[in-house]
Amino acid sequence: MAHIDRINILANHLSKEEEEENELLTSPVSADKKKETVTVTDNRNGKSYDFKIKNDTINALNFKELQLAKGDGGLMIYDPGFQNTAVVTSYITYIDGDKGILRYRGYPIEELAERSNFLEVAYLLINGNLPNKSQLDGWSNKIMTHTFLHENLVGLMKTFRYDAHPMGMLISTVAALGTFYPEANPALAGGDIFKSENVRNKQIYRIVGKLPTIAACAWRHRIGRPYNTPVNHLGYTENFLYMLDKLSEPDYKPNPVLCRALEILFILHADHELNCSTAAMRHISSSGTDPYTSVAGAAGALYGPSHGGANEAVLDMLIHIGSKENIPQFISDVKSKKKKLMGFGHRIYKNYDPRAKIIRRVAYEVFESLGKEPLIEVATELEKQALEDEYFVSRKLYPNVDFYSGLIYKAMGFPTDMFPVLFTIPRAVGWLAHWVEHLEDPETKIYRPRQVYKGEWFRNYVPIDGRPPAKVRSQDSYSSATTKRYSKVTSH
């Protein structure tokens, strides 16, 4: 199996020689070896240290050696937001942001979007290689036979308010899902249960299979319609669209153009290296918890507007612009910092996001089937003018994956509060791929970042009667809107 092969590869790499590769060098280094080191001089005491370079990284623990006095703990690396810190070695997704390259397990995203389907890409990400036909058939069958929800779980979803946010419903339901499978909880069944590939795979089938059902139920709940049950002989995205839209038609068939469009969108969103939610997945999993808890936590990270809400912000921006005639003024406002240009630029990509090129094409295919979305003309003209403007080009601001995806979802009839849900379904496959890799990595440790403490150094306890008024934060300066909202909550 691919999992066992990767374990053997990792084990072979962890020879004594390689374990010492990133350690501090205490003996002279030859001229040739010097090319693979970096010399750090501590100007506080004049001492110099040679650190080995491996895979373009330096072991952060080396800096503990930079001490003024023995045992003082040395130096730490300060990196807010992990902007230049690698915490894992991964074999899943490769990104070259300067060249605009994205590959899953070595396969260009363009080829996978053109020729593959979502469940095949899911197999690739989680297992490491593309399956043959019998492997893909078995994989797809196991996932599609785990699409149904327990009646008690359905009952739980029905207790949410009629206007509950679909993402909140999804997160809560996924977290609750773990309570239905205590045999998959290391806290109950033993910390080593996921050494069993069968136990591990069972949870993958369940999560990948049930997420579209949970998402569809959240959508139906929001619009006040009865939940639909899955139809397992349909494809993954076809079944999802069926559960979303079927009313009373005896032979309802989702639009095949929309099925394929959603398939491509799911492929493009399946993984993107160590983004915020994937890092959360690995962080939570490092404590040894079950994957349902970890996926719910990762989904919570994705719920944040800076991560999973970007395409909604693009849509709001395009609606605000309104027409092509207003674009020059909008661009002028962006340059003068009066407005923000959403859907352009990326923390990693300093070139055109390869996913955006694919989504642009998919958008036009969807509009040909459903009718043109008026905002597409605004989007394409905004893209054209921005890419011809030196202000944006010099800052390497190119369209990203969110620029067109929201337009497609809007054309398909999804409200903006479903956008993060549509992001979560495919990204869960990436989370699970990282979960498997984390379980198999012999270097895995519980995540425990350091901090730089800048608080009070030492204070003696003072009895309450002898204390002056304490300095308070902003608790007493709520906005009037917030105060009203809190008063409504507390009055119920």
Curated annotation (Swiss-Prot):
Its main location: other. The active site is at 307, 346, 402. Keywords: Peroxisome, Transferase, Transit peptide, Tricarboxylic acid cycle. Pathway: Carbohydrate metabolism; tricarboxylic acid cycle; isocitrate from oxaloacetate: step 1/2. It is found in: Peroxisome. Its EC number is 2.3.3.16. Belongs to the citrate synthase family. This is Citrate synthase, peroxisomal. It comes from Dictyostelium discoideum.
